[in-house]
Amino acid sequence: MERNGEIVNNGSIIIPGGGGPVTESPLDQFGIHPILDLNIGKYYVSFTNLSLSMLLTLGLVLLLVFVVTKKGGGKSVPNAFQSLVELIYDFVPNLVNEQIGGLSGNVKHKFFPCISVTFTFSLFRNPQGMIPFSFTVTSHFLITLALSFSIFIGITIVGFQRHGLHFFSFLLPAGVPLPLAPFLVLLELISHCFRALSSGIRLFANMMAGHSSVKILSGFAWTMLFLNNIFYFLGDLGPLFIVLALTGLELGVAISQAHVSTISICIYLNDATNLHQNESFHNCIKTRSQS
């Protein structure tokens, strides 16, 4: 098969005129390719493999919830699907109660839908890339950055709604000398804003690095397996077992990232709703007003 003047044979690119086969990059699995091109007036809209993967994840979650909750609710003796949904439903409130303090149960309950949707979507979205011929949505930095920034902005709005201008008191830790206040305020502001960036980078880096490692070792084991040499075949058993172990590890990392992201959201919400009774900010303002 020819592609752009090159001959593609068994997943390798053979350049005419010499050079031998050139193996495709392991990063090709993260490429975004249009499936359906749409032109709406002056705007070009394309339905890509990324869009398809996100719709499949959403459809899987909705289908699972529908199967469990149909006919008026679950069964007294839960099956595997109902047990999974109940486990997710019980896990998120317990996490909220553990990580967010100083609030009543009714106030915490308001955060449950956002945190539950984020955790459920991440739980099904991250391991999706381990399925052959699928696409890893969270392997793209723009996707993870958009998710982290939207959550960061929402948490900041919650902090202003609850505390008003007193929300700025988190910029000045308690017991800080007044000459160091400007430097620490700037440092705390940068640290606070960097939370949105760090959450997106952490998820993106874990997904891309792990999936790339599995792809590289899988390609190496596959090549060794089909070499016409018994020693290469026997030597391939080691990399093959490593690939199996790394696949299980990457699946665990993909699931644990949903847990880590949810804990981060709860910690940020706790910092936004509980300012740890920091009074140095008010003392600084009071001193300036009296002088």
From Swiss-Prot:
It is found in: Mitochondrion inner membrane. It comes from the Eukaryota. Its main location: mitochondrion. GO terms for cellular component: mitochondrial inner membrane; proton-transporting ATP synthase complex. One of its GO terms (molecular function) is proton transmembrane transporter activity. Keywords: ATP synthesis, CF(0), Hydrogen ion transport, Ion transport, Membrane, Mitochondrion, Mitochondrion inner membrane, Transmembrane, Transmembrane helix, Transport. The chain crosses the membrane at residues 47-67, 140-160, 167-187, 207-227, 230-250. Belongs to the ATPase A chain family. F-type ATPases have 2 components, CF(1) - the catalytic core - and CF(0) - the membrane proton channel. CF(1) has five subunits: alpha(3), beta(3), gamma(1), delta(1), epsilon(1). CF(0) has three main subunits: a, b and c. This is ATP synthase subunit a.
